[in-house]
Amino acid sequence: MEPRKFTVLGTVVGWPNDEEVYAAGAYLLIEGEGEVVPGTFEYGPITNEEFEERFGFQLPDGITAVEFSAYVIPREG
């Protein structure tokens, strides 16, 4: 099967505190979809402007939207 991009969007308090914990949790969610293609896991915060443009509302102060993504080879079944 061909790899496909899988994305998880999280909202976190106090980013980048505990960045590794958030990244590990998102990785596990993505890994649940299939085999993660090595070297494709990426993440980073989304600007408030981009978040509002994409979702139509603003996040409260102190909350950051973070996008986590990787290419995954889906499980057959």
Curated annotation (Swiss-Prot):
Domain of life: Viruses
This protein's name: Gene 43 protein
Origin organism lineage: Viruses, Duplodnaviria, Heunggongvirae, Uroviricota, Caudoviricetes
